[in-house]
Amino acid sequence: MIPLDPAQRAAELRCRLQEANYHYHVLDQPRIPDADYDRMLRELDALEAAYPDLATPDSPTQRVGHTIATAFSEVRHTVPMLSLNNAFSDPEVLEFVRRITACLGETAPGFSAEPKLDGLAISLRYQNGIFIQGATRGDGVTGEDVTANLRTLPTIPQRLQSDTWPTVLEVRGEVYMPRPDFEAYNTQARLRGWKVLANPRNGAAGSLRQLDPHITAQRPLSFYAYGIGEVTDDVSFHRHSEILASLRAWGFPVSPLVELVYGSEELLNYYRRMETIRDTLPFDIDGIVYKLDDLSGQREMGFVARAPRWAIAHKFPAQEQTTTVEAIEIQIGRTGAATPVARLTPVQVAGVTVTSATLHNADQIARLDVRIGDTVIVRRAGDVIPEVVTVITDSRPLGATAWSMPMACPVCGSEIVRETGAAVWRCSGELACPAQRKEAIRHFVSRRAMDVEGLGVKCIELLVDAAVVHGVADLYHLSLDQLLRLRLVTNAQTPTMLLREARDHVTGMRYQQLEEILRTVGVDLSGEGDVPKHWQIDVLRAQWPDFDWNHKKIATKWAQNLIAAIDRSRQTTLERFLFALGMTHVGETTAKALAHSFGDLAIIRQLPWPLFKCVPDIGGEVARAIGHFMDQPANQQAIDDLVERGVRITDTHPPTSTLRDQLTLASLLEHLDIPKITPLRAVQLAALAPTLPLLAEAALDTLLQAGVSQPAAQSLTEWFQSPDNISLARRLQHCCDVLLAQLPSADRAHTAPLNGQSVVLTGKLASLTREAAATRLEMLGAKIVGSVSKKTSFLVAGEDPGSKLDKAHALHVDIWDEARLLAFLGQYSAQ
């Protein structure tokens, strides 16, 4: 039993300390001396130590004191943390405003103009006014739980002020390190022999991701709020400026530099003023964010891909420095793109040591006339990617010659080619090129593709160089023995060290075999000769004797975890699989659109390129790239190999009925991009024959007599004279007929069982991912939303559902468990 006086005193101290925090960090009006604050904090800490039941999660004493974590858990954002499109010039800002005025019909709409802090974006979740969880932005959909570390920031309220806040509130903002505090920290770090921080942004990000909150508490971090995520229905807003005002009232610091401005002229004036005072601010900013103030206007403008159309980041010119070009090298990407890179004399740019900079492509080098030995101006584009922007030709050394793209790939020796009209040169080696294979595998296992955790860049390079992995399908044949060999060899800095470590796992004749392998690759075991440069790769390529691995002498958990992660990736969704294939021009959005429209890998891999234009937002260039990829026997073999090794698509479904209008003969003629065949002319031609092959037989005179114009008729007949085009037309018609046969009937299309229904998913599902479940439900007409409200049709609840389930009960929303969901999906599939 807690005596009454200590409980009252603890409550009083918490109230006074929270009020002091609010006045100090939000209002910038300290009410009590620091000494008094420290005295009250110590008194409260002593009371909570004497009476542990007095401690509350929102107590100021809880800002430090959590145990060290072993890793950060994932947090799925209820409302995605979107990225912003960038503007680097005034005309881009003017175009941004023009689009909004044209859409909304307003001549001078209001915008919230806010400095873009150079820190780490986070999301703070409050329930009933109490801070319960904080997460990093991550990839915008999933972040890391850094709640314990965020509790150490005095600028983040543990309990909200006032009593007007909603039941559930997600606050979005930026954790940053003030410049004076950053400099003071580095001064102390140098005196104490600690590692100094590279720049305030890296300092903020690294500090917030410390596993030990005590370390975070020692770092001078601060926070500004700039928006909201999920908010329950008991609070509503009409303007973004109202949101910021409410955040201030609830205890959050909001930048005092935020202004409400009207029209493009005021936007640019604000930008100029901030650019002028940028270097005098106590924190780093890399631009200005403009947000449409009217929330109904925001909803009308909507989004494109992962960015809102009602907001934009107007970036400042990046910081620049001069340095010297020591060499120009070629890097080969996963699609074969040959990107020239300048190797530079190291130079500090925006707090980072820059040793190389992109030259983008051969045309850019020609425009700049960059040569080896030149003095150049380097900047960090967007303050992230270093690039060469100008050559100081007055400093050019005598004899410097113009650079030209090499004709052979520096990695595999294949010809480097450029398609007519393209800016990018590409290695023609495709998957025969180790550089492309490495990048293809790196992309394949990435988080938003097949999501194989634990397979890093260095490991991928060694697996490819050692010929253990030739393509992505080989990952599914990796064994524990292969991975342990990799670790044993790479940990050995010298051949002698390898032999010493190997004695724990192999003896006798097999040990002698290993010695012979080393001799074969050119190693002098006497230790007198030079060690071959690539001895580790050559040793890994050799036929090894069997090892009896001593698990006490070599770490195996990482290898077991990696094999388990690879195995888990065998079950995936169609959009992830398509994205993982790394097709040129196919990002996540396009992969999702393909999966939604066609629904089945077996269909997609057989389609000719024009049918990909049936998918919304896929144009001719992207469609041709997808078709080209699927037409390559090596790529088809790679897909076969993946399927053979157990990769399964878990969300296969029939093609969407919306394709029907795109599969008419007139639409097919449009998709073929035949010169002179306009949409109107395509409709006219479609009336002359039921199929493409029959239309191909029509003579020029027949077309002219039917009223087709001379240019269009001539163009069509010439196009059909090509055997390749005839073959394409026949294939296109056949695939079109197959697709039409698989489409849901028109009646079924209009009576999708979930048309108009809003569905929320929460908790973990055992049989399929929430992502896959959402896709299946969307195919049946449902709209997937992030929060429960009175308008929610039903909630799908898996394990550990959280507060959404409680709210669904309170609002009498229908609740489905996983069994009911699977039964419903199975019933539809059966139909």
From Swiss-Prot:
<feature type="binding site">
    <location>
        <position position="114"/>
    </location>
    <ligand>
        <name>NAD(+)</name>
    </ligand>
</feature>
<feature type="binding site">
    <location>
        <position position="315"/>
    </location>
    <ligand>
        <name>NAD(+)</name>
    </ligand>
</feature>
<feature type="domain" description="BRCT">
    <location>
        <begin position="749"/>
        <end position="831"/>
    </location>
</feature>
<feature type="binding site">
    <location>
        <position position="409"/>
    </location>
    <ligand>
        <name>Zn(2+)</name>
    </ligand>
</feature>
<dbReference type="InterPro" id="IPR013840">
    <property type="entry name" value="DNAligase_N"/>
</dbReference>
<feature type="binding site">
    <location>
        <position position="427"/>
    </location>
    <ligand>
        <name>Zn(2+)</name>
    </ligand>
</feature>
<keyword id="KW-0234">DNA repair</keyword>
<comment type="similarity">
    <text>Belongs to the NAD-dependent DNA ligase family. LigA subfamily.</text>
</comment>
<comment type="function">
    <text>DNA ligase that catalyzes the formation of phosphodiester linkages between 5'-phosphoryl and 3'-hydroxyl groups in double-stranded DNA using NAD as a coenzyme and as the energy source for the reaction. It is essential for DNA replication and repair of damaged DNA.</text>
</comment>
<keyword id="KW-0460">Magnesium</keyword>
<dbReference type="Pfam" id="PF03119">
    <property type="entry name" value="DNA_ligase_ZBD"/>
</dbReference>
<dbReference type="InterPro" id="IPR012340">
    <property type="entry name" value="NA-bd_OB-fold"/>
</dbReference>
<dbReference type="InterPro" id="IPR036420">
    <property type="entry name" value="BRCT_dom_sf"/>
</dbReference>
<feature type="binding site">
    <location>
        <begin position="34"/>
        <end position="38"/>
    </location>
    <ligand>
        <name>NAD(+)</name>
    </ligand>
</feature>
<dbReference type="InterPro" id="IPR013839">
    <property type="entry name" value="DNAligase_adenylation"/>
</dbReference>
<feature type="binding site">
    <location>
        <position position="174"/>
    </location>
    <ligand>
        <name>NAD(+)</name>
    </ligand>
</feature>
<dbReference type="Pfam" id="PF12826">
    <property type="entry name" value="HHH_2"/>
</dbReference>
<dbReference type="GO" id="GO:0006260">
    <property type="term" value="P:DNA replication"/>
</dbReference>
<dbReference type="GO" id="GO:0046872">
    <property type="term" value="F:metal ion binding"/>
</dbReference>
<keyword id="KW-0464">Manganese</keyword>
<dbReference type="InterPro" id="IPR004149">
    <property type="entry name" value="Znf_DNAligase_C4"/>
</dbReference>
<dbReference type="InterPro" id="IPR041663">
    <property type="entry name" value="DisA/LigA_HHH"/>
</dbReference>
<feature type="binding site">
    <location>
        <begin position="83"/>
        <end position="84"/>
    </location>
    <ligand>
        <name>NAD(+)</name>
    </ligand>
</feature>
<feature type="active site" description="N6-AMP-lysine intermediate">
    <location>
        <position position="116"/>
    </location>
</feature>
<feature type="binding site">
    <location>
        <position position="412"/>
    </location>
    <ligand>
        <name>Zn(2+)</name>
    </ligand>
</feature>
<dbReference type="InterPro" id="IPR001679">
    <property type="entry name" value="DNA_ligase"/>
</dbReference>
<keyword id="KW-0235">DNA replication</keyword>
<keyword id="KW-0520">NAD</keyword>
<dbReference type="InterPro" id="IPR010994">
    <property type="entry name" value="RuvA_2-like"/>
</dbReference>
<dbReference type="InterPro" id="IPR001357">
    <property type="entry name" value="BRCT_dom"/>
</dbReference>
<keyword id="KW-0436">Ligase</keyword>
<dbReference type="InterPro" id="IPR018239">
    <property type="entry name" value="DNA_ligase_AS"/>
</dbReference>
<dbReference type="Pfam" id="PF03120">
    <property type="entry name" value="DNA_ligase_OB"/>
</dbReference>
<feature type="binding site">
    <location>
        <position position="433"/>
    </location>
    <ligand>
        <name>Zn(2+)</name>
    </ligand>
</feature>
<feature type="binding site">
    <location>
        <position position="137"/>
    </location>
    <ligand>
        <name>NAD(+)</name>
    </ligand>
</feature>
<feature type="binding site">
    <location>
        <position position="291"/>
    </location>
    <ligand>
        <name>NAD(+)</name>
    </ligand>
</feature>
<keyword id="KW-0479">Metal-binding</keyword>
<dbReference type="InterPro" id="IPR004150">
    <property type="entry name" value="NAD_DNA_ligase_OB"/>
</dbReference>
<protein>
    <recommendedName>
        <fullName>DNA ligase</fullName>
        <ecNumber>6.5.1.2</ecNumber>
    </recommendedName>
</protein>
<dbReference type="Pfam" id="PF01653">
    <property type="entry name" value="DNA_ligase_aden"/>
</dbReference>
<dbReference type="GO" id="GO:0006281">
    <property type="term" value="P:DNA repair"/>
</dbReference>
<dbReference type="Pfam" id="PF00533">
    <property type="entry name" value="BRCT"/>
</dbReference>
